[in-house]
């Protein structure tokens, strides 16, 4: 390798942390645009009137954000989660979060009829359930309420720190 190429590559590698930081910042901005929609879908799927604690009370929207924002999470799935929420809002003319319970059910059923919508709802359901029943150290399943509702508890030994922080 010639000296000039070495210096160019060295400079590019030195900039990598800043390039990554820009991506994370843009993701946070994008998530803020659709976070309310995702939270509303999660709350509709797991409402407060069921045996299982509500998605809202368990903090699963924050769990979803932290999970898909992690650097090891698949970028395509991350984009899929955001784009799916944007598509749902587009189909509902930006008013999904304002719809009644019955209208949300109708909108989600219609969205589920599309292949894209079916896959998106499945992904949201999966991540939401991961949050509802994960070890509370990961920020959801507050007070182990998900485990209590199922009369099941996490394995032993319990995590002492978040896996993503190791």
Q: Where are the model-predicted features located?
A:
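Mature-region segments of soluble proteins
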Residues: 36, 40-43, 51-53, 59-166
């Amino acid at each position: 390798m010639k000296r000039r190429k070495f210096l160019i590559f060295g400079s590019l590698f030195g900039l990598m942390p800043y390039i990554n930081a820009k991506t994370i910042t843009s993701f946070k901005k994008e998530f803020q645009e659709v976070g309310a929609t995702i939270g509303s879908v999660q709350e509709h799927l797991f409402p407060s009137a069921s045996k299982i604690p509500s998605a809202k009370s368990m903090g699963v929207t924050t769990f979803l954000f932290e999970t898909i924002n992690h650097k090891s999470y698949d970028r395509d799935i991350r984009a899929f989660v955001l784009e799916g929420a944007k598509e749902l809002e587009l189909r509902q003319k930006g008013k999904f979060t304002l719809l009644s319970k019955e209208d949300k059910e109708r909108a989600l059923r219609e969205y589920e009829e599309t292949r894209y919508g079916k896959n998106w709802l499945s992904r949201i359901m999966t991540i939401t359930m991961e949050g509802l029943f994960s070890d509370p150290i990961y920020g959801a399943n507050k007070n182990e309420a998900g485990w209590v509702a199922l009369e099941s508890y996490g394995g032993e030994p319990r995590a002492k720190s978040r896996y993503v922080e190791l």
